[in-house]
């Protein structure tokens, strides 16, 4: 068998692919290659997924088909090893009360009487970073996955690189502020760590360049010419009508970062891609392949025009958009003829061990502490790297403003609503509680509660505003029910099934009729049945009487058996739990 070695990797692509595929099979995961793209020469991307759980998927990119597949499989292990596939979901009562929730080496810190953050969590530097005003409470740090207040706060062990001490960081903080940044998997520990550190630099420098509207130096043609495969890809894109700018993003040789920007003159938009690696050529190739990962040439019309509004470009919401799908705003200043930094033909490359030391030296120079959790329980090296002040995707204030566990205390209540028989005023009190606690009416209930509902039921599209309509119906407040029904039709009907949209049209009509004291409802029954169908009229009538206000919501138990999608997710997680238990028992 041929052996293909590429820079930055400690094993041949063929060996990595065979090993990754065998390990996944041994763990019980059936992975399929769902789609391939090769829109220009030397740019490949692939989408792979679990045949049994559609929520577990990754994308890979590379200059060759093998490189893209190895990339996707590596990312799959990265997300399995760090539990990232499950980051947005509650894992149910059984796992929440099991021997361990995340890893056997996790540590639980019971909540204190005064709700202070317990001793033993975080170090002084982290406490000062996350909570400078000393306002953080312990109950804010319950993890979404367990939602188990009785057990307390789950801390995961990280090694502080300056002195190799173990520091416990709450899973809640990791999930809320860092999401997928700094996660990596590789053939060796150093390869994985170099990849993770490179990603931290990539996102940090990208945010600085965008937020500060920095003008970057172009990479000279003679330097680009050293990488003919990249040049061929760029020339093909330009021949298709997409001007390309390739920039040195190192900010004067400080960081191993490249930026490539694509213009789409057909609609006046642009898209900036960033990549990082100690090897200049690897960083350049990654940036160009990232530009087209998961995209064909027909998919390059969804970005935004450059702007002169530097304040809007620098807003955190814009930077978050860039993290999610790179479709945020870019300043025209990026393209100024006179760059803010000179071009540097940088090179930080060496063995992966040397590259790790080189990248760590940059963090040390900037006085940034690096915390690393290494994972080997799946037979593949993986890690999660946290660099407070550099790798944060969301600001620390989100622990107060947008904590992913902020709806956990309502989960049992909301899931019990279908089939409930409360006093009418209790339903109306729940509307008041939702208002008092400041929940956005547009929030999807499944996301608030951490549910994988599948798309075949009312829970999938349910937002807080629609829930208020249902609660008002159950509480007998038809005027308030009409307000929230009309809100639902205006803001949510575009995602409804035809059946659900028809139900709401019927419900609105019946609610409007209920306000007409002089009209007799029975006079209109035949017309309503002809317009909306007997089923919709019956369902809307039952909702208005309070008999069945929660249309399309099935009852849900504490382990979420009502949701097949969630059950497939839990089955995947149980495979990981078995592997963790076996590894840590050695």
Curated annotation (Swiss-Prot):
Q: Which InterPro entries match?
A: YcaO-like_dom, YcaO_C
A GO-annotated cellular component: cytosol
Q: Which PROSITE patterns match?
A: YCAO
What effect does gene inactivation have here?
Mutant shows a decrease in the ratio of methylthiolated to unmodified S12 and a decrease in transcription of a subset of genes.
- Where would I find the YcaO domain in this sequence? 60-437
The entry lists its GO molecular-function terms as: ATP diphosphatase activity; magnesium ion binding
- Superkingdom, taxonomy of origin: Bacteria
Give the residue spans that cross the bilayer: none
Summary of the function given for this chain in its UniProt record: Involved in beta-methylthiolation of ribosomal protein S12.
Instruction: Describe the subunit structure.
Output: Interacts with the ribosomal small subunit.
User: What name goes with this protein?
Assistant: Ribosomal protein S12 methylthiotransferase accessory factor YcaO
Originating organism: Escherichia coli (strain K12)
- State the taxonomy lineage: Bacteria, Pseudomonadati, Pseudomonadota, Gammaproteobacteria, Enterobacterales
- Gene encoding this chain? ycaO
């Amino acid at each position: 068998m041929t052996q293909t070695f590429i820079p930055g990797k400690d094993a041949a692509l063929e060996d990595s692919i065979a090993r990754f595929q065998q390990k996944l099979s041994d763990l019980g995961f059936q992975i399929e290659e769902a789609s391939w793209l090769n829109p220009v020469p030397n740019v490949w991307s692939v989408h792979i997924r679990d045949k049994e759980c559609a929520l577990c998927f990754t994308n890979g990119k590379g200059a060759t088909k093998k490189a893209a597949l190895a990339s996707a499989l590596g990312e799959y292990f990265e997300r399995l090893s760090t539990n990232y596939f499950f980051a947005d979901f509650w894992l149910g009562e059984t796992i929440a009360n099991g021997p361990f929730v995340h890893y056997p080496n996790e540590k639980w810190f019971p909540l204190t009487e005064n709700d202070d953050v317990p001793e033993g969590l975080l170090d002084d530097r982290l406490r000062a970073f996350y909570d400078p005003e000393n306002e953080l409470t312990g109950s804010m740090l319950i993890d979404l996955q367990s939602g188990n207040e009785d057990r307390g706060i789950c801390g995961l062990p990280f090694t502080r690189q300056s002195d190799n001490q173990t520091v416990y960081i709450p899973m809640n903080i990791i999930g809320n502020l860092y999401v997928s940044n700094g996660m990596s998997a590789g053939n060796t520990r150093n390869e994985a760590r170099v990849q993770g550190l490179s990603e931290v630099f990539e996102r940090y420098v990208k945010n600085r360049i965008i937020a500060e509207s920095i003008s970057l130096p172009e990479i000279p043609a003679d330097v680009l010419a050293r990488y003919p495969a990249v040049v061929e890809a760029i020339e093909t894109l330009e021949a298709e009508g997409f001007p390309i700018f390739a920039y040195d993003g190192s900010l004067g040789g400080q960081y191993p970062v490249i930026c490539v920007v694509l213009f789409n003159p057909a609609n006046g938009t642009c898209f900036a891609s960033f990549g990082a690696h100690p090897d200049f050529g690897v960083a350049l190739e990654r940036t160009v392949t990232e530009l087209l990962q998961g995209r064909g040439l027909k998919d390059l019309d969804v970005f935004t025009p450059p702007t002169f509004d530097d304040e809007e470009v620098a807003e955190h919401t814009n930077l978050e958009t860039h993290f999610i799908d790179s479709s945020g705003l870019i300043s025209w200043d990026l393209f100024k003829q006179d760059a803010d930094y000179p071009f540097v033909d940088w090179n930080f490359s060496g063995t992966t061990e040397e590259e790790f030391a080189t990248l760590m030296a940059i963090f040390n120079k900037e006085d940034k502490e690096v915390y690393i959790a290494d994972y080997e329980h799946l037979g593949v090296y993986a890690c999660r790297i946290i660099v407070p002040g550099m790798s944060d995707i969301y600001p620390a204030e989100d622990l107060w403003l947008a904590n992913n566990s902020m709806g956990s205390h309502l989960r049992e209540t909301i899931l019990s609503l279908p089939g409930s028989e409360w006093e009418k005023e209790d339903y109306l009190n729940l509307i008041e509680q939702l208002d008092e606690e400041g929940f956005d009416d547009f929030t999807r209930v499944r996301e608030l509660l951490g549910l994988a509902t599948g798309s075949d039921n009312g829970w999938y599209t349910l937002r807080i505003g629609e829930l208020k309509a249902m609660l008002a119906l159950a509480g007998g407040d038809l005027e308030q029910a009409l307000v929230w029904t009309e809100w639902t039709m205006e803001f949510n009907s575009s995602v409804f099934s035809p059946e659900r949209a028809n139900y709401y049209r019927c419900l609105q009509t019946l609610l409007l009729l209920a306000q007409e004291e002089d009209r007799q409802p029975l006079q209109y029954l035949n017309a309503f049945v002809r317009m909306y169908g007997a089923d919709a009229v019956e369902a809307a009538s039952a909702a208005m009487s309070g008999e069945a206000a929660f249309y399309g919501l099935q009852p849900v138990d504490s382990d979420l058996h009502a949701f097949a999608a969630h059950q497939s997710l839990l089955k995947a997680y149980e495979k990981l739990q078995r592997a963790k238990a076996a590894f840590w028992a050695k």
